[in-house]
């Protein structure tokens, strides 16, 4: 499988290097038991920033999960970024999930918008409208249908990273962003999309099918 990114995300390299060096210095100067809590933190940082390749389903009208986590919302509501009624599916990431964000559909980026905001628990519904967030509006290459991906910062996560811009073409499963330390991604779909997940279900980025789009 071709996944052109290191298995440990680059976003975590400074944190991992710092944790490792401090643990090593304390281990050398004070011994293993004093350093043990620091080694545990180092292992946690290592697992948090893991970024493994994932198989990508071939179904042409599938909308793939943009993140690892748990489904917390499946509802019809307004998509304020594309100004339409939409089906909204939200994925909550806890600190033990992979936090690399991946594209749900093939298409061209129409708009990228960043919104400053609060940092309430990303598991709460109000996080979608009150928290710091970054929206990417994508128009599918195949049929022009619009899918909006919104990275939402959480109580601990206060750093949204997005690596795409308007006019770029994206592919399903492509890595496009990262959120540090607990967060969520909201996905807004056409109203006639058929959800394939339920609230409470665990999903994997670019492997789990969130919904199927109606063929146009």
Swiss-Prot record:
Post-translational modification: Is synthesized initially as an inactive proenzyme. Formation of the active enzyme involves a self-maturation process in which the active site pyruvoyl group is generated from an internal serine residue via an autocatalytic post-translational modification. Two non-identical subunits are generated from the proenzyme in this reaction, and the pyruvate is formed at the N-terminus of the alpha chain, which is derived from the carboxyl end of the proenzyme.
InterPro entries: PS_Dcarbxylase, PSD-A
Residues bearing PTM Pyruvic acid (Ser): 183
GO CC, alphabetical: plasma membrane
MF (Gene Ontology): phosphatidylserine decarboxylase activity
Domain of life: Bacteria
Positions marked as site (Cleavage (non-hydrolytic)): 182-183
Predominant location category: membrane
Family note: Belongs to the phosphatidylserine decarboxylase family. PSD-A subfamily.
HAMAP family associated with the record: PS_decarb_PSD_A (MF_00664)
Protein name in the entry: Phosphatidylserine decarboxylase proenzyme
């Amino acid at each position: 499988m071709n996944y052109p990114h290191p298995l440990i995300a680059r976003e975590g390299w400074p944190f991992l290097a710092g944790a490792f060096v401090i643990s090593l210095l304390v281990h050398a100067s004070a011994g293993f038991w004093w350093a043990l809590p620091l080694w545990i933190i180092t292992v946690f940082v290592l697992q948090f920033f893991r970024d493994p390749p994932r198989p990508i389903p071939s179904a042409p009208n599938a909308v793939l999960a943009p993140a690892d986590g748990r489904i917390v919302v499946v509802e019809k509501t307004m998509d304020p970024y594309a100004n339409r009624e939409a089906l909204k599916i939200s994925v909550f990431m806890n600190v033990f999930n992979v936090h690399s964000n991946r594209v749900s559909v093939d298409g061209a980026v129409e708009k990228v918008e960043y919104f400053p905001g609060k940092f309430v628990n990303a598991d709460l519904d109000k996080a979608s409208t009150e928290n710091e967030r970054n929206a990417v509006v994508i128009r599918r290459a195949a049929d022009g249908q619009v899918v909006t991906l919104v990275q939402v910062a959480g109580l601990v996560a206060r750093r949204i990273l997005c690596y795409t811009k308007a006019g770029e073409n994206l592919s399903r499963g492509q890595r496009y962003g990262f959120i540090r330390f607990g967060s969520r991604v909201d996905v807004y779909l056409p109203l006639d999309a058929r959800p394939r997940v339920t609230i409470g279900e665990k999903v994997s980025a670019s492997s789990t099918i969130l919904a199927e789009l109606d063929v146009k």
